[in-house]
């Protein structure tokens, strides 16, 4: 279970204070994947980072009663000076996992051939995103955190393998995905919420959340 209890979060932009959450309570139960609709500018990445423990709330408490992933696309745990192979082995050891398995899994999924043995500083943004996505799926978590869906890739084979693996995770774990596009959430979410004007409003279905989100977007 992941629980936000009376959590508030804001930061200073240089000209004004921007509020992300204002004294909000919600929880994510294991087995119930949550899709969060959030317009651009609501700083949804901060919300995901708080779930992962990368950022602290200003007030309130966040309880993590299970194993929660780093956010998809988070590169803070990898070193651009090292190769993907070296990074995969390093992260595996941090999680007390078999480095050879994690290395092989990431190499198979990303499939970037000789680049796998080159420093990640030489990678394109797309290659970095694919590697971090592979690394997240290589590790076993109870809750997977995704910001704006799967990484965009023109590689049809990668999209197929990654999509199948993510669906397998959805079937047996919990996904929390945040996006400004309702269609991004359709294949992942069993429940939904809207983050807007520092309020977190939960709904039983994505369609209910979409109706409120679309209506407020027109105001």
Features from the language model and the residues they span:
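A short, flexible loop at the N-terminus of ABC-type nucleotide-binding domains that lies
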Residues: 1-27, 33-35
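Conserved H-loop
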Residues: 181-188
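Conserved beta-strand-loop-alpha-helix hinge in the C-terminal portion
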Residues: 160, 198-219
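Conserved catalytic network of the ASCE P-loop NTPase/AAA+ motor domain
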Residues: 63-64, 137-138, 167-171
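ABC-family P-loop ATPase nucleotide-binding domains
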Residues: 10, 67, 72-156, 164
């Amino acid at each position: 279970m992941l629980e936000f209890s009376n959590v508030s979060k804001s930061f200073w932009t240089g000209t004004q204070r921007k509020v992300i959450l204002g004294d909000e309570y919600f929880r994510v139960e294991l087995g119930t994947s949550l899709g969060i609709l959030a317009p651009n500018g609501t700083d949804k990445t901060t919300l995901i980072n708080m779930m992962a423990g990368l950022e602290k709330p200003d007030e309130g408490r966040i309880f993590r009663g299970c194993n929660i992933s780093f956010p998809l696309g988070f590169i803070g745990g990898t070193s651009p000076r090292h190769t993907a192979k070296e990074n995969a082995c390093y992260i595996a050891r941090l999680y007390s996992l078999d480095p050879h398995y994690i290395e092989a899994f990431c190499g198979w999924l990303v499939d970037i051939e000789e680049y796998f043995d080159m420093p990640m500083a030489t990678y394109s943004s797309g290659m970095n995103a694919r590697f971090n996505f592979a690394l997240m799926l290589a590790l076993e978590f109870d809750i997977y955190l995704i910001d704006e869906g799967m990484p965009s890739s023109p590689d049809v084979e990668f999209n197929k393998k990654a999509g199948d693996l993510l669906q397998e995770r959805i079937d047996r774990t919990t996904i929390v995905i945040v996006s400004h596009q309702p269609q991004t959430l359709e294949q992942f979410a069993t429940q939904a919420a809207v983050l807007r004007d520092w309020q977190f409003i939960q709904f039983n279905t994505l369609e209910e959340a979409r109706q409120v989100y679309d209506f407020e977007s027109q105001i």
